[in-house]
């Protein structure tokens, strides 16, 4: 974390109920809230969906309630919360020749999928802190390219020479390099121009383009597509989020004047495997 932030306290805890962690809030200049169980940790059932919801919506409610117990002068000035680009509706079916080329900015309405409702409710709990005089930022994040995480799962088929596009390959995928994501979070802590929802992405590319670029970065072919039916058989409902997408664009970051270190997909992938 850059030295200009001063003292940084990292807290790893269960946010389902108040506890000793609340002491770290008093006098903090900002809170960066990244809690949430991995969406792709396991196949979804009713219990897993509840875990995903509790680890985001309920945890954020508990956090804001803890902030409310502080004296106004001791409250954080900013709450920077994670959110997801899945906030937006699915694009039309991939058979549509255009597959929804319309750019999606932060002003777009939420969707009605499970993750869209989850992100909507998650953000609503964070935005409740505004009533306490706290500036709230919700980072609607796409795929983050960096060591581990989503990229590690994406590269495995390519390493085995069986990588390729998913489904039609026409679905849009918003992406950002991990270093740029961190820089945006750091800026949001102190820069008051960051407020409300922020599309945390560099741009969006077609899934087929992402697969081709990933194969190039790994020195592997990208010739074997993954059929939609096979993905649905393996992942169930979660597959819909890989087979559909929206052309999410970072309108607010552009307006603020954010500068990306890795503006091109090829460059971002080349610096994502260290």
List the model feature ranges, each with a label.
Residues 240-274:
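C-terminal amphipathic/interface module of NAD(P)-dependent oxidoreductases
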Residues 49-51, 61-113:
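Conserved Rossmann-fold NAD(P)-dependent oxidoreductase catalytic core, especially the SDR/UDP-sugar
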Residues 191-237, 270-274:
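Mid/C-terminal beta-alpha module of Rossmann-like enzyme folds, strongest
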Residues 2-59:
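NAD(P)H-binding glycine-rich loop region in Rossmannoid oxidoreductase-like domains
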Residues 120, 132-134, 145-153, 188-198:
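Glycine/proline-rich active-site loop of Rossmann-fold NAD(P)-dependent oxidoreductases
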Residues 54, 58, 93-138:
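Catalytic helix-loop patch of NAD(P)-dependent Rossmann-fold dehydrogenases
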Residues 127, 155-164, 170-205, 274:
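Alpha-helical substrate-binding/gating segment
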Residues 110-115, 140-148, 168-176, 189:
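Glycine-rich "substrate-gating" loop/helix at the edge of Rossmann-like oxidoreductase active sites
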């Amino acid at each position: 974390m850059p030295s200009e932030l001063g003292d940084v306290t990292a807290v790893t805890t269960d946010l389902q109920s108040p506890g000793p962690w609340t002491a770290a809030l008093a006098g903090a200049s900002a809170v960066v809230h990244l809690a949430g169980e991995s969406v792709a940790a396991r196949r979804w059932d009713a219990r897993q969906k509840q875990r995903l919801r509790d680890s985001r919506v309920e945890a954020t409610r508990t956090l804001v309630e803890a902030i409310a117990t502080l004296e106004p002068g001791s409250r954080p000035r900013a709450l920077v919360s994670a959110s997801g680009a899945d906030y937006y509706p699915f694009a039309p079916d991939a058979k549509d020749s255009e597959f929804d080329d319309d750019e999606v900015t932060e002003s777009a309405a939420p969707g009605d999928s499970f993750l869209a409702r989850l992100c909507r409710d998650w953000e609503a709990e964070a935005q409740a802190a505004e009533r306490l005089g706290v500036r709230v930022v919700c980072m609607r994040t796409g795929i983050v390219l960096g060591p581990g995480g989503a990229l590690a799962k994406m590269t495995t088929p390519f390493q085995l020479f069986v990588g390729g596009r998913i489904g039609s390959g026409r679905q849009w995928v918003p992406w950002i390099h991990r270093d740029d994501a961190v820089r945006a979070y750091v800026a949001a802590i102190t820069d008051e121009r960051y407020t409300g929802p922020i599309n945390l992405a560099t741009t969006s590319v077609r899934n087929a383009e992402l697969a081709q670029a990933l194969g190039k970065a790994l020195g592997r072919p990208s010739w074997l597509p993954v059929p939609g039916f096979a993905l649905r058989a393996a992942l169930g409902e979660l597959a819909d989020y890989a087979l559909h997408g929206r052309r999410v664009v970072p309108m607010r970051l552009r307006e603020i004047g954010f500068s990306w270190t890795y503006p091109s997909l090829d460059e971002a992938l080349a610096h994502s495997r260290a």
